[in-house]
Amino acid sequence: MGRGKIEIKRIENPTNRQVTYSKRRNGIFKKAQELTVLCDAKVSLIMFSNTGKFHEYTSPTITTKKVYDQYQKTLGIDLWSSHYERMQENLRKLKEINNKLRREIRQRMGEDLGDLSIEDLRGLEQKMDASLGLVRERKYHVIKTQTETYRKKVRNLEEQHGNLLLNFEAKCDDPHYGLVENDGDYESAVAFANGASNLYAFRLHQAHPNLHHDGGYGSHDLRLA
């Protein structure tokens, strides 16, 4: 019993479709290799899967470029002429745009003004005024932003300074703050001078009897540490 006819249509299942593609691609490449060996044919195959993956086979006796060159020579056509002409046209347009932009830059620098009409000069003046306005607006924005930043820093420093002063004054109001008994000596660690936050340390020592005062420090003297 003969094999039934297989209907040729797109395989819907992606996995089955990929498996079939791989098998038949390998079969075609095998046939191309057989043609190259058995018949001394020059074969070039290029294949792209539905996912865009590229595969090719070229006979060892020829290159892909030689195949294209022989194809063009045989048919009398040029595959690259139209593409080259489009590239040349795009290059010409880009050069024109570049030259125009360079000319506008020179004119805004005060150069190449001799060929401009009164209308062109007025238009250039308006463009430069608009550009100047944008630059000035940006400058003021930067100045304002920097000023606000500096003001915030100053306020933070003033707040820190105020907190330090309050903390210092609170400690100074404590009669026991800064006085520590140390083997009969007493040390004062904090004092204000002329309202500033300069810190001095005073020590009471039992030496130097010539500095004693009646009813004063008794057997202690006061000196700057």
Curated annotation (Swiss-Prot):
**Pfam families associated with the record:** K-box, SRF-TF
Could you tell me in which tissues this protein is expressed? Expressed during flower development in stamens, petals and carpels. Expressed in fruits and seeds.
Q: Which residues form the signal peptide?
A: none
Q: Does the keyword Nucleus apply?
A: yes
An example Gene Ontology molecular-function term: DNA-binding transcription factor activity, RNA polymerase II-specific
Matching entries from InterPro entries are given as:
MADS-box/MEF2_TF, MEF2-like_N, TF_Kbox, TF_MADSbox, TF_MADSbox_sf
Q: Which Gene3D superfamilies match?
A: Transcription factor, MADS-box
| Domain (MADS-box) ranges | 1-61
One GO biological-process annotation of the entry reads: positive regulation of transcription by RNA polymerase II
Assigned keywords, A-Z: DNA-binding, Flowering, Nucleus, Transcription, Transcription regulation
Q: Give the record's GO CC terms.
A: nucleus
Q: Which PROSITE patterns match?
A: K_BOX, MADS_BOX_1, MADS_BOX_2
Q: What is this protein called?
A: Agamous-like MADS-box protein TM6
Natural source organism? Vitis vinifera (Grape)
Which lineage ranks, top first, belong to the organism behind this chain? Eukaryota, Viridiplantae, Streptophyta, Embryophyta, Tracheophyta
Q: List the gene name.
A: TM6
